[in-house]
UniProtKB/Swiss-Prot annotation:
GO terms for cellular component: cytoplasm; microtubule. It comes from Mus musculus. This is Tubulin alpha chain-like 3. SMART domains: Tubulin, Tubulin_C. One of its GO terms (biological process) is microtubule-based process.
Length: 446
């Protein structure tokens, strides 16, 4: 089998993980206790169930008793959020050893997450990952969920990625990263954390799918009609993206996409590995359309700014690569027509050194939705991952915020007292300036 290990780090990573595994269980017909719903009865009633769970082993380990345990690890430096999972609806789905927490918080600082507090639990976390890896017959790689702005998400992840690169050097590492929003901030020192972690993980991460809270809030408010979106609503949106990206690993389909194929098709140069994500259709459960949207409709929606999960305007940049992952009632002929229509649009510009540009995945398993959730059930959906030079706008925004604080040496003492040096800040900022330049250069014509 080609198994994948999911690692959820910090408050954002853990809460996204909770939403992801809830959705995966619904998609595979797994109950909160880990057992598949009346397996034999289901097979007689619905022969698709057996086919549906043919590739289940990539994400779930089946015990002798027939229980399906997720191949995952949840980790936070303080216990509150992990305790929420220990007593939550899916508490019996996970083995207690898969839920790891420290005793004190990273206090929103990269330095505590990486050095002082993080270093105390890193060996335990690696030991638990080793145990999970030993249950795999052919480990394909790691999916790492975290935020750039938090202390644990930024600091501990950079320490872990470094160690994983040593112990599992050939295994692919894909990230789902919550990027600091332009206007909504959960911590004053987010720009420091984000730039330090980007610098320290850029060589260890193979591909990082970007989402940001502001774009997600806007989708919840404008598309789903939620006046005051909760983190639960936002995390379920991210879970839909994660599910679409991993669907071809978990279900059979006519055009499957392997983990390494994302890297091969989306990353033209090692450092340019930050694709933006978009999802369509996003329809509220209350306003569920009577007519279903066509393949062309959902494909066109993905190229609209309002369907993107990151605040940046792709019309201001050029696409280097684009991966379209379709689910449900979709046939290749419709996809080809939809792509041809998109290529003829002047607003969708590709760099001249990448003329084809589109990678396609098709999976017949329609998207599932959480009962009582915000999203409507649809027959077909598409998730778009696109590597575009427009993301440089997001990096430039972040760099500017970093510069404003660093010019006054504001909040630096929290990092220095944990053993960091000013040189690390300077080095990280220079690396990000180089990253901005890299993006500008790849967008240039010959």
């Amino acid at each position: 089998m080609r198994e994948c290990l999911s690692i959820h780090i910090g408050q954002a990573g853990v809460q996204i993980g909770d939403a992801c595994w809830e959705l995966y269980c619904l998609e595979h017909g797994i109950q909160p206790d880990g057992f598949i719903l009346d397996h034999q009865h289901d097979n007689l009633e619905n022969p698709k169930v057996e086919h549906m769970n043919a590739s289940l082993d990539t994400f779930f380990h089946e015990t002798r008793a027939g229980k399906h345990v997720p191949r995952t690890l949840f980790m936070d430096l303080e216990p509150t959020v992990i305790d929420g999972i220990r007593v939550g609806r899916y508490h019996s789905l996970f083995h207690p050893e898969q839920l790891v927490n420290g005793k004190e918080d990273a206090a929103n600082t990269y330095a505590r997450g990486r050095y002082s507090v993080g270093s105390e639990v890193i060996e335990l976390v690696l030991e638990r990952i080793r145990k999970l890896a030993e249950q795999c017959s052919g480990l394909q790689g790691f999916l790492i969920y975290r935020s750039f702005g938090g202390g644990t998400g930024s600091g501990f992840t950079s320490l872990l990625m470094e160690r994983l690169s040593v112990e599992y050097c050939k295994k692919i590492k894909l990230e789902f990263s919550v990027y600091p929003s332009p206007r909504i901030s959960t911590a004053v020192v987010e720009p420091y954390n984000a730039i330090l972690t980007t610098h320290s993980t850029i060589e260890y991460s193979d591909c990082a799918f970007m989402v940001d809270n502001e774009a997600l809030y806007d989708i919840c408010q404008h598309k789903l009609g939620i006046e005051r979106p909760s983190y639960a609503s936002i995390n379920r949106l991210i879970a839909q993206v994660s599910s679409s990206i991993t669907a071809s690993l978990r279900f059979e389909g006519p055009l499957n996409v392997d983990l390494i194929e994302f890297q091969t098709n989306l990353v033209p140069y090692p450092r340019i590995h930050f694709p933006i994500t978009a999802l369509a259709p996003i329809i509220s459960a209350e306003k569920a359309y009577q007519e279903q949207l066509s393949v062309s409709d959902v494909t066109a929606s993905c190229f609209e700014v309002s369907n993107q999960l990151v605040k940046c305007d792709p019309r201001l940049g050029k696409y280097m690569a684009c991966c379209l992952l379709y689910r449900g009632d979709v046939v290749p002929k419709d996809v080809n027509e939809a792509i041809a229509a998109m290529k003829s649009r002047t607003s969708v510009q590709f760099v001249d050194w990448c003329p084809t540009g589109f990678k396609v995945g098709i999976n017949y398993q329609p998207p599932a939705v959480v009962p009582g959730g915000d999203l409507a059930r649809v027959q077909r959906a598409v998730c778009m991952l696109s590597n575009t030079t427009a993301i440089v706008e997001a990096w430039a925004r972040l760099d500017h915020k970093f510069d404003l604080m660093y010019a006054k040496k504001a909040f630096l003492h929290w990092y220095i007292t944990e053993g960091m040096e000013l040189g690390e800040f300077v080095e990280a900022r220079e690396d990000l300036a180089a990253l901005e330049k890299d993006y500008e250069e790849v967008g240039l014509s010959f």
